[in-house]
Each structure stands twice: as structure tokens, then as C-alpha cells.
């Protein structure tokens, strides 16, 4: 829990199996929310949000944070991971103190803003003040909001560090520092920013990390800023492919994918679907081709203006747009309950991204279907994904319509 410059961590902090998985050292299970001794207003917010009983990660992950332990939680996207750390954070806040007590980092603006919405909903009866500090929004708004006082800040590394560095985000009263999607946050792109932020935090701050995947090399990085963490593991091959039917369609050549997608539209009644492409250019190209053939669809990627992206997400969540073509910008943590189908128009470059993509199609045990377009050049990549998750992806059957119903 202490700043590593003051107390160098030992190698015992994170146990890593030869498979690259963390070894769980915490097995206490809490069967119901009432048994966590939560404040009445927080419990009321949890039930009002629609939760009835905690999911597997919530049964294991909330209590160690409440008890003050640094915590590493590994669980699949869509299992209630966000609510795990949000519920714990809301319980630790002193609402009479008008100061930031929880700082939470996420890798993307969309994920940070979604976490803020979950926190405000769960903390509705607690009168929670939670602000999202993300790039692409007004710096002046951040300054004014932080100056007026908030209990919790959710943000992306660049903007959060900026607010810390300029003194607008004060962390004198910080109790809990959370990183969501820890694998992404600690990867090469964010590692330096995370360390710069951590150096500015109180020495005794409690740290929690949650993610669907935690590669071996990432776990070793956690020794630099965690002390004797409680480790909670959902084994990689159990990470969720349960409830999600996975298929592939052989398309031989890349240029045949478009016709294959059209064929699928003609045979499937799709309630709501996400189509993933590997590049922004590819998203634009596919969207243009679909619209030229009179198929209604939306598209979103990182080159778009932040406000435009928010409008597109609102339309998709409301159901006014039923097909969304996107890059991996959307793959981590976007909660769209109605999605019944995910199509990987392009197989992901990294096997670890696969679970984030198809996790959108079966949230909280809701059944979903994932269809992967596989060219001859993609066969090796498909086999890598199967090995990585210890799963088998079958060829799409003729009766796919029955499976979706």
C-alpha cells in the first residue's frame, strides 16, 4: 500500500504461476449484498440499480477492498467487475467530507464516463459527487468542478495527471486508487503516466487493480506500487466464453467479406449487433459500402470528435441504431445490454483483445453469439485464440437463425 520509493516491494507481492496466471490467495465468499454491512443508502442504490445478488467477482472482490487490502481482481468483461470496485469505493467514502477520496483510472474516455454513470446511479441515495476527468472535454469545466469539491474522480491518465500537476485535483484525503483494465493501463502506452500519477498520491493509499486479462509481465509491474495484495482469480479458460456461442465463417479472401456480411443480414434477424474492424480506415470503408447498399448502420472510431462519438453511443444504447461498426475503441467495458451478436469482420491482432470484443455479446450470463470472419491467412490467428482461451470455435452451421432466437 505504500509508495515503493519508501518501502521497496518484495517479489512475494505477486505470485505468478508458470501459465502466467495469478494465483489466488483469497477465497472468502460473501453470498449476498446485505452481508457486506454496507450503508443503508448504498444498499438501496444497489437494489434500485437492478442488482439482486452479487456476481462471482462481486462475492469475492468487494470485501477485501472494504477491509483495506490492496487487491488484484482478474475476471472476464461482463461479470460485474465495474460494480465490484464502485460499490467498495462508495462504502469507503465519507460523504460529509467535501474532498476527493477515490481516484479511478480507465484507459478510454468512454469507459471512464460509463464508470462515472454507474457510480452516480449506485450512489444516488448517498448524494455522491463524482466527476469524469477525461481528454476531449473542457479543461475549465474540470477545474471548476474539482474546485467545488467532489468525492470521487474517474478519469483517463493524461487529464488526471494534468489536473494533479496543476494542483486542481487535490489528493490529501485520498483513500483508494483504482485501475480498471489494468493490463491496458500498465501496457507500454500508459505505464509512465501511471507511475507519474502514483508518485503524487499519499504514501498509504490503498490500491486496487481489475482486468479481464493479466499477462505475466504486467503482474510483475504491480510489485512497484502494491503491498501484499489479495489476489482473486477467475481462471483464463473460464473467463467467459460461457453463454457465448462462437462460430467462424471461412471467407478465403479478404475481399469476399463484404458479400459474406450481406448474406448474414439476409438470413439473420438481428436485434442489435456490433461489427469490429481492425483499423479506422476499415470502419469508414465498410460503413460506406453498407450504406451504399441501403443497410442502416452507425460507425465509431478514435478519429471522430468526442461529441459525435457520444451521440452515436446514445443512439446505439437507445436502440435507434441497431448496427454499430467500430474499432477496438469500443472493445473494453462498453455496456450495451441489448447486443445479441458480435461480428469480428477482422480477427483481432492480439488474442487478449478477443475476450473484450465478444464480452459485449453476453453480459451477466445473457446468451450471445460471436461470428468470426476468417480468411485463409487468418487460420493461424484463429488457432492462437482457441489455444489462448482453451476453447473451440466451430464453423457456423446452416441453422444459425435458430441459435440467435
From Swiss-Prot:
Enzyme class per UniProt: hydrolase
Family membership: Belongs to the DEAD box helicase family. eIF4A subfamily.
Disulfide bond among keywords: no
Name of the encoding gene: EIF4-A
Residue window of motif Q motif: 31-59
EC code: 3.6.4.13
InterPro entries in alphabetical order: DEAD/DEAH_box_helicase_dom, EIF4A_DEADc, Helicase_ATP-bd, Helicase_C-like, P-loop_NTPase, RNA-helicase_DEAD-box_CS, RNA_helicase_DEAD_Q_motif
Sequence motif DEAD box, residues: 180-183
One Pfam family it belongs to: Helicase_C
Biological function: ATP-dependent RNA helicase which is a subunit of the eIF4F complex involved in cap recognition and is required for mRNA binding to ribosome. In the current model of translation initiation, eIF4A unwinds RNA secondary structures in the 5'-UTR of mRNAs which is necessary to allow efficient binding of the small ribosomal subunit, and subsequent scanning for the initiator codon.
Keyword Protein biosynthesis: yes
CDD domains: DEADc_EIF4AII_EIF4AI_DDX2, SF2_C_DEAD
Binding site for ATP: 75-82
Organism of provenance: Cryptosporidium parvum
Helicase ATP-binding domain ranges (all copies): 62-232
GO molecular-function terms, A-Z: ATP binding; ATP hydrolysis activity; RNA binding; RNA helicase activity; translation initiation factor activity
Matches recorded under Gene3D superfamilies: P-loop containing nucleotide triphosphate hydrolases
Oligomeric and partner information: eIF4F is a multi-subunit complex, the composition of which varies with external and internal environmental conditions. It is composed of at least EIF4A, EIF4E and EIF4G.
Protein name: Eukaryotic initiation factor 4A
Keywords: ATP-binding, Helicase, Hydrolase, Initiation factor, Nucleotide-binding, Protein biosynthesis, RNA-binding
The reaction(s) this protein catalyses: ATP + H2O = ADP + phosphate + H(+)
PANTHER family noted in UniProt: ATP-DEPENDENT RNA HELICASE DBP3
Boundaries of every Helicase C-terminal domain copy: 243-404
Amino acid at each position: 500500500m505504500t509508495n515503493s520509493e519508501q518501502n521497496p516491494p518484495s517479489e512475494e507481492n505477486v505470485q505468478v504461476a508458470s501459465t502466467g496466471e495469478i494465483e489466488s490467495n483469497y477465497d472468502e465468499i460473501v453470498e449476498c449484498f446485505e452481508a457486506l454491512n454496507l450503508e443503508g443508502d448504498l444498499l438501496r442504490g444497489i437494489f434500485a440499480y437492478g442488482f439482486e445478488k452479487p456476481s462471482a467477482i462481486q462475492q469475492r472482490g468487494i470485501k477485501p477492498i472494504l477491509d483495506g487490502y490492496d487487491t488484484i481482481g482478474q475476471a472476464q468483461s461482463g461479470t460485474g467487475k465495474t460494480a465490484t470496485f464502485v460499490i467498495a469505493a462508495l462504502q469507503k467514502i465519507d460523504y460529509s467530507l467535501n474532498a476527493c477520496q477515490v481516484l479511478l483510472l480507465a484507459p478510454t474516455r468512454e469507459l471512464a464516463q460509463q464508470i462515472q454513470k454507474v457510480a452516480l446511479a449506485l450512489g444516488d441515495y448517498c448524494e455522491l459527487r463524482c466527476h469524469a476527468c477525461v481528454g476531449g472535454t473542457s479543461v475549465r469545466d474540470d477545474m471548476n468542478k474539482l474546485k467545488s469539491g467532489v468525492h470521487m474522480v474517474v478519469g483517463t491518465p493524461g487529464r488526471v495527471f494534468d489536473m494533479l500537476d496543476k494542483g486542481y485535483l487535490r489528493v490529501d484525503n485520498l483513500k483508494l486508487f483504482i485501475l480498471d483494465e489494468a493490463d491496458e493501463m500498465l501496457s507500454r502506452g500508459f505505464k509512465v503516466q501511471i507511475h507519474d500519477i502514483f508518485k503524487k498520491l499519499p504514501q498509504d493509499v490503498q490500491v486496487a487493480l481489475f482486468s479481464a486479462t493479466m499477462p505475466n509481465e504486467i503482474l510483475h509491474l504491480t510489485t512497484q506500487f502494491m503491498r501484499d495484495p489479495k489476489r482473486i482469480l477467475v481462471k483464463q479458460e473460464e473467463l467467459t466464453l460461457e453463454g457465448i456461442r462462437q462460430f467462424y465463417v471461412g471467407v478465403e479472401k479478404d475481399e469476399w467479406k463484404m458479400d459474406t456480411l450481406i448474406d448474414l443480414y439476409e438470413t439473420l434477424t438481428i436485434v442489435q449487433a456490433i461489427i469490429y474492424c481492425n483499423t479506422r480506415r476499415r470502419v469508414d470503408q465498410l460503413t460506406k459500402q453498407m450504406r451504399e447498399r441501403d443497410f442502416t448502420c452507425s460507425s465509431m472510431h478514435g478519429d471522430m470528435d468526442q461529441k459525435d462519438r457520444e451521440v452515436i453511443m446514445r443512439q446505439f444504447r437507445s436502440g435507434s441504431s441497431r448496427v454499430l461498426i467500430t474499432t477496438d475503441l469500443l472493445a473494453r467495458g462498453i455496456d450495451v445490454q441489448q447486443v445479441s451478436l458480435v461480428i469480428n469482420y477482422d480477427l483481432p491482432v492480439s488474442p487478449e483483445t478477443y475476450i473484450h470484443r465478444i464480452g459485449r455479446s453476453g453480459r451477466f450470463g445473457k446468451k450471445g453469439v460471436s461470428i468470426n470472419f476468417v480468411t485463409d491467412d487468418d487460420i493461424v490467428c484463429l488457432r492462437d485464440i482457441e489455444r489462448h482461451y482453451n476453447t473451440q470455435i466451430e464453423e457456423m452451421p446452416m441453422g444459425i437463425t435458430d441459435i440467435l432466437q
